[in-house]
């Protein structure tokens, strides 16, 4: 072997990938081996964003001392939240509602329907009316979280079969509404279930279309939350067309992403008489700000003006019950308790502290309803 061959061999070995022996530490990236020479915290984007949070002005956070001041605060913050959500889609001049199917079950009747929320945009929903009550019924707009969409809350399994075991983390809570003598108006949120694009539908029932749709909304200066709130408002319009439902006794409830929709809808829509938020009330800081969440949760610039507890405070003095799992790993329980304490202060300034409640339970991110459903029934009573 010539000197030139030896030189080539040496050069090749120097350029070859370094093989780590069994038991050796895994390669950690470009700073591997240089950790002691740098401040690792200065490379952490979450720590960077948390420092920015500390400087967030929260210009419209609650600080009122009496009801008059609280009402003035609500007016300002409600207008700002509407602005931040972006303009709502245009409402169709008529709902063009259509019944697709009616089925009878032992404890309730279920009607599948559609209506036009915005020109060219339909909403699918299910009206579940109880057999243990007399019309006109209180109506609870019921919004599912991420999963298979509205099927997850009306008693339909992943094969399209009826079920009675209340499976999944959402436990068919729309069916549970009827068991408490109220009607459930369960809607399919945009980008969930049947309201997904064809490409996303090919990926399976559990794959939401929040990406790219929520991103598209942001590029348009709008938000997925705004679109979903608008659908809730139009659902309440639809409720007003049904003689078996009482439009003066409308509630709203949802879990997770449905809890997001419920909180913002109740904050902005005065026709919602009572609300139940499951698996969502927390702080932005400790949930969607710090943990990996779906893009449908984000409202650009909101931390310049308010925290989540401030938005929830816009519901006051209308009744609000929040529930939180003590093992919830995406909406941490301690932050949920902190947030509710701030919401409670708003209700107390209104002189209605008893109308705000928080139930915690020994489980993960899931629907519970032990206190929440009786709470809605009590506050939506005729």
Which residues does each PLM region occupy?
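N-terminal export signals
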Residues: 5-26
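Non-catalytic accessory segments flanking enzyme active sites
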Residues: 50-128
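Proline/glycine-enriched tight loop/beta-turn segments at coil->beta junctions
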Residues: 121-122, 131-139
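Cap/lid segment of the alpha/beta-hydrolase catalytic domain
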Residues: 143-230, 287-291
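Mobile cap/lid helix-loop segments that gate and shape the active-site cleft of serine hydrolases
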Residues: 212, 216-220, 230, 234-235, ...
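Alpha/beta-hydrolase fold nucleophile elbow
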Residues: 245-254
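Short beta-strand/loop motif that positions the catalytic acidic residue
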Residues: 322-324
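C-terminal catalytic histidine-bearing segment of alpha/beta-hydrolase fold enzymes
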Residues: 341-342, 347-382
């Amino acid at each position: 072997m010539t000197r030139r061959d030896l030189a080539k061999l040496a050069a090749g070995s120097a350029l070859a990938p370094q093989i780590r022996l069994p038991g050796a530490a895994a390669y950690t990236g470009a700073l591997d081996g240089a950790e002691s020479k740098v401040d690792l915290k200065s490379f952490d984007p979450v720590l960077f964003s948390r420092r920015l949070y500390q400087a967030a002005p929260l210009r419209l956070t609650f600080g009122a001392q009496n009801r008059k001041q609280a009402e003035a605060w609500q007016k300002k913050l409600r207008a700002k939240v509407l602005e931040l959500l972006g303009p709502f889609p245009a409402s169709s001049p008529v709902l063009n509602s259509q019944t697709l199917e009616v089925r009878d079950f032992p404890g309730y009747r279920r009607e599948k329907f559609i209506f036009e929320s915005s020109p060219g945009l339909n909403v699918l929903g299910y009206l579940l009316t109880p057999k243990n009550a007399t019309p006109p019924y209180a109506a609870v707009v019921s919004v599912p979280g991420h999963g298979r969409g509205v099927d997850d809350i009306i008693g339909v399994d992943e094969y399209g079969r009826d079920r009675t075991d209340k499976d999944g983390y959402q436990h068919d809570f729309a069916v549970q509404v009827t068991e408490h003598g109220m009607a459930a108006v369960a809607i399919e949120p945009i980008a969930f279930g049947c309201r997904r694009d064809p490409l996303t539908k090919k990926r399976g029932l559990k794959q939401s279309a929040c990406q790219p749709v929520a991103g598209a909304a942001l590029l348009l200066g709008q938000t997925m939350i705004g679109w979903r709130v608008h659908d809730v408002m139009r659902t309440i319009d639809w409720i007003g067309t049904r003689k078996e439902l009482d439009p003066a006794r409308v509630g709203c409830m949802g879990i997770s992403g449905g809890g997001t929709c419920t909180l913002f809808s109740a904050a902005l829509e005065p026709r919602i008489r009572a609300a139940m938020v499951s698996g969502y009330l927390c702080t932005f800081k400790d949930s969607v700000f710090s943990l990996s969440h779906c893009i449908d949760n984000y409202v650009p610039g909101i931390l310049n003006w308010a925290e989540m507890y401030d938005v929830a405070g816009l519901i006051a003095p209308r009744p609000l019950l929040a529930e939180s799992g003590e093992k919830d790993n995406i909406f941490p329980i301690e932050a949920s308790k902190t947030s509710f304490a701030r919401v409670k202060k708003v209700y107390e300034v209104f002189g209605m502290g008893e109308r705000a409640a928080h139930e915690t339970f020994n489980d993960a991110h899931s629907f519970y309803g032990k206190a929440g459903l009786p709470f809605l029934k009590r506050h939506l009573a005729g």
